[in-house]
Curated annotation (Swiss-Prot):
EC number(s) per entry: 3.2.2.23, 4.2.99.18
Top-level taxon of the source organism: Bacteria
Keywords, alphabetical: DNA damage, DNA repair, DNA-binding, Glycosidase, Hydrolase, Lyase, Metal-binding, Multifunctional enzyme, Zinc, Zinc-finger
Annotated protein name in UniProt: Formamidopyrimidine-DNA glycosylase
Residues binding DNA: 90, 109, 150
FPG-type Zn finger ranges: 235-269
Pfam name, any one: H2TH
Matching CDD domains: EcFpg-like_N (cd08966)
Gene name linked to the record: mutM
Function: Involved in base excision repair of DNA damaged by oxidation or by mutagenic agents. Acts as a DNA glycosylase that recognizes and removes damaged bases. Has a preference for oxidized purines, such as 7,8-dihydro-8-oxoguanine (8-oxoG). Has AP (apurinic/apyrimidinic) lyase activity and introduces nicks in the DNA strand. Cleaves the DNA backbone by beta-delta elimination to generate a single-strand break at the site of the removed base with both 3'- and 5'-phosphates.
One Gene Ontology molecular-function label: zinc ion binding
Family: Belongs to the FPG family.
Transmembrane segments: none
SUBUNIT field: Monomer.
Amino acid sequence: MPELPEVEIIRRGIEPWVVGHIIQRAEIRNNQLRWPIDQEIISIHQRRVISLKRRAKYLLMQLHHGWIIIHFGMSGRLRILAHMLPPEKHDHIDLIMSNNCILRYTDPRRFGAWLWSNNLDKMSILNNLGVEPLSDQFDGHWLFTKSRNKSLLIKQFLMTNKLVVGIGNIYANEALFAAGILPSRASCSLKEQEALLLARSIKAILLSSIEEGGTTLRDFLQSDGRDGLFAKKLQVYGRHGEPCYTCGEFIQIAKYGQRSSFFCPSCQN
């Protein structure tokens, strides 16, 4: 599933090709994604894109009369085509742009969504989202304060979107390793210095992934079709039974909240 870094990479990749340009029309080949595509998107005609923003794992495309809200689900991706190519089986949506490029949405599992809103403030899926981990608001003090009365395991805390958005399983594992904290620790057990280090680690891991083009494990590709290279920097995620690069101890795996957690029993405590 694309997490915050992957969605931000897609946003940056397609922004120069769509912002300031006009959507001439949409070609919808499959209306049945996670939810049916709104008629406003299906019938879009000659509408200029004003801005392209990201909130959590949502892309927000602003037009003069409303917003297209895109969520990538498990396997969705967007790419820019310099000219029309024959669509393949899972190419469900094209936005035909005035600059002769095509914005193509591909989603093999069809868990993604294309939604429409006249007013983002009234979108319930956005209203209950937590703090952005790359914002100034998110820091060690915030993390320490918010975790005081939480019985959640720290890994689950980091993946609760009502608290903090977009970190996801891969980056939660990597950040906890970087901070030397076991995923099974109760969030309320964090000491203030641990919270400061964890917040810094989260920011550093997310920014590093963005710089490397994200993490390609299965479906994710950048908007130009390239793989993300952060997978080569993973320290614990997906490395069960392999030696830790730092200490040589074998990476272990456990399930908390039905999600796999990878950790080094020596480097993390």
